[in-house]
Amino acid sequence: KIIFFGNGGSASDAQHLATELIVRYKKKRKAIPAISLTTDTSALTAIGNDFGFKYIFSRQLEALGNKGDLCLAITTSGNSQNLIEAAKLSKKMGINFHAFSGNNGGKLKRYTKNLILIPSKTTSQIQVIEIFLGQILCNYLETFASK
């Protein structure tokens, strides 16, 4: 299963990519297990209220993630504490943590060896490249992993 998440525009990208895998990217095929942790407003607001905003992804990951899953954090800065908490928990749970990030990877680069770095500090440029990379990922998975 692939678990996507991010904040703001990156949250939208996470939802978009998970949907491409569940429904279809280009062709009719078996669904690829994927989820975005940015869609459940009840969970997001309850976790934010009861535990703190920095745990909105790690708490869901604790409930929904399994050893061998793949997480993809999407970020323009690499400095969001909620992504860092998810990276830390992923390691403890045996979940493969990957990230797309601009801004030199920010603090998040300390917590993953699987960082695709977009060499820009301009949010709009970073977001365009991140969704492009996500589309490449969807195409690859649909072509090779859904057989």
Predicted regions and their residues:
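Glycine-rich phosphate-binding loops that contact phosphosugars or nucleotide phosphates
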Residues: 4-5, 10-147
